[in-house]
Amino acid sequence: MTTELRRVFDEDAERYDRARPGYPPQIFEDLAAAGAPPPARVLEIGLGTGKATVSLAERGYRITGIELGASLAAAAQRNLTDHPAVTIVTGSFEEWTLPEEPFDVVFAATSFHWIDPATRVSRSADALRIGGLLATVATHHIKGGTEVFFAAAQRLYERYDPRTPPNLRLEPARDIPHDDAEIAASDRFGPADFHRYEWDAAYTTSEYLDLLLTYSTTRSMPRPEQSALLDGIGRLIDEEHGGRIVKRYLSELRLARRIR
């Protein structure tokens, strides 16, 4: 199912580019401060439409980006027209032939969890020089923002999507655990270091519905249930929240240095 779901993002690349948020600028400052300043060579896995890639390129990194979806890769190419130091490859990281020259950084923003868990850490190590950094960004929806809305929206998810865990509630950032298990289990990386960033994004009704249609869980719903869910959420925002809600995010940068 994961292999199938990771392909749904390519179905509507323009919506993805329009609706998905970017990343806190401090992520890229902390990456540089960790020993990987520009013009380091970066391999970005799953760049999508280039949300993080643009920020890296603007800082002077030399980037090879690999993207599974052809439509997403084409959108990224358009977004990065002014950055000749970026090369975009269409394909899967698992099957791509690594170049002979290793990279200084392997970077993945909200994409590493889509890579085969059996090989993603070891293959990232293969792509890096000794001392190079594996930098992954995870994005979490956390407690905060328009909390009353999200509690009500949860009931709509439970009604229309049977995959929804019952009584699911948003957690504060402090309750989200660091995910270092796969790094700790590898003998090729040192201990993981974590940096966290909380931030808010405001959405109108149409903007939020657009965002929901970029999520794999929403896109994979049967069409009648998907339409009913989106209609219900749209009415909820319009009628109870004046057509605008705020969502709180936690972005987490995980850094691990290759040691062998």
PLM feature segments, named:
Residues T110:
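Short catalytic micro-motifs in class I SAM-dependent methyltransferases
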Residues W96-V105:
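A short acidic, Gly/Pro-enriched loop at the edge of an enzyme's catalytic core
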Residues I115-S124:
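A short, conserved alpha-helix within the catalytic core of class I
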Residues M1-E14:
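N-terminal, positively charged/glycine-rich alpha-helical extensions of SAM-dependent methyltransferases
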Residues T49, R174-R260:
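Conserved Class I S-adenosyl-L-methionine
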Residues R41-L43, T49-W96:
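Class I SAM-dependent methyltransferase SAM/SAH-binding core
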Residues P21-A40:
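Conserved alpha-helix/loop element of class I SAM-dependent methyltransferases that forms part
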